[in-house]
From Swiss-Prot:
GO molecular function: 5S rRNA binding; structural constituent of ribosome
Name of this protein: Large ribosomal subunit protein bL25
Entry annotated with the keyword NAD: no
Gene this chain is encoded by: rplY
Pfam family, one: Ribosomal_TL5_C
One annotated GO biological process: translation
Listed Gene3D superfamilies: Ribosomal protein L25, beta domain, Ribosomal Protein L25, Chain P
Subunit structure: Part of the 50S ribosomal subunit; part of the 5S rRNA/L5/L18/L25 subcomplex. Contacts the 5S rRNA. Binds to the 5S rRNA independently of L5 and L18.
Family: Belongs to the bacterial ribosomal protein bL25 family. CTC subfamily.
UniProt keyword annotations, A-Z: Ribonucleoprotein, Ribosomal protein, RNA-binding, rRNA-binding
């Protein structure tokens, strides 16, 4: 991906619970950048800007351009700690990436065409999204923002698995996902619909 979301952060000098509390009171969120050959770097970010960025799907699954003290580095968001009941981000972790090394990360799934599938059109089935993201491995340049799951051919009683997802060139399922091949979507007929069909069958009067 050529375009990267930009994140601006500042070097954080103070550490500890008290310092973190003071930063939160000042509208800041603490964070850390780690990975690669450089030492871990303590940072702080504007809370409001971070809060709005976290609402974007791409912020969680794309390579980010993190600027700290005027220097940019490519990172992935690896962890977010939220306050248990307030709309507050307590801490974020970013991992540096090496453009020449494959990375393992989760990518969102976008489900398409369920309404035109035989399961829905012919059987009035309900298509359930069992998982909403899948873990892949690829070079940073090949990392997709999301993966599309085509449901147009799914029939009632069928499931789609991880290996059914069409992956872009250079992208593969991680070994454990490939081995487990988990279900990502399934089509089932609601119990009520089955009962109605059964009732209709029972209501038919046999020919004399």
């Amino acid at each position: 991906m050529e375009n990267h979301m930009k994140v601006v952060a500042f070097e954080r000098q103070q550490q500890g619970t008290g310092a973190s509390r003071r930063l939160r009171n000042a509208g800041k969120t603490t964070g850390i950048v780690y990975g690669g050959e450089a030492a871990p770097q303590m940072i702080e970010l504007d809370h409001n800007a971070l809060w709005h960025a976290l609402k974007k799907e791409a912020f969680h699954s794309s390579i980010l351009d993190l600027e700290v003290a005027g220097k940019s580095q490519r990172v992935l968001l690896r962890d977010v700690q939220y306050h248990p009941f307030r709309q507050l981000v307590l801490h974020v972790d970013f991992q540096r990436i090496d453009p020449k090394k494959k990375l393992h990360t989760k990518v969102p799934l976008h489900f398409l065409n369920a309404e035109s599938s035989p399961a829905v059109k012919l059987s009035s089935a309900v298509v359930s999204h069992v998982v909403t993201e899948i873990e892949v491995e690829c070079l940073p340049a090949d990392l997709p923002e999301f993966l599309e799951v085509d449901l147009s051919k799914i029939e009632a009683g069928q499931s789609l698995h991880a290996k059914d997802i069409v992956l872009p060139n250079g992208v593969a399922l991680t070994p454990h996902v490939d081995a487990e091949n988990p279900v990502v979507a399934s089509a089932t007929i609601p119990a009520g619909a089955v009962s109605e069909e059964a009732a209709a069958g029972e209501g038919e009067t046999p020919a004399a």
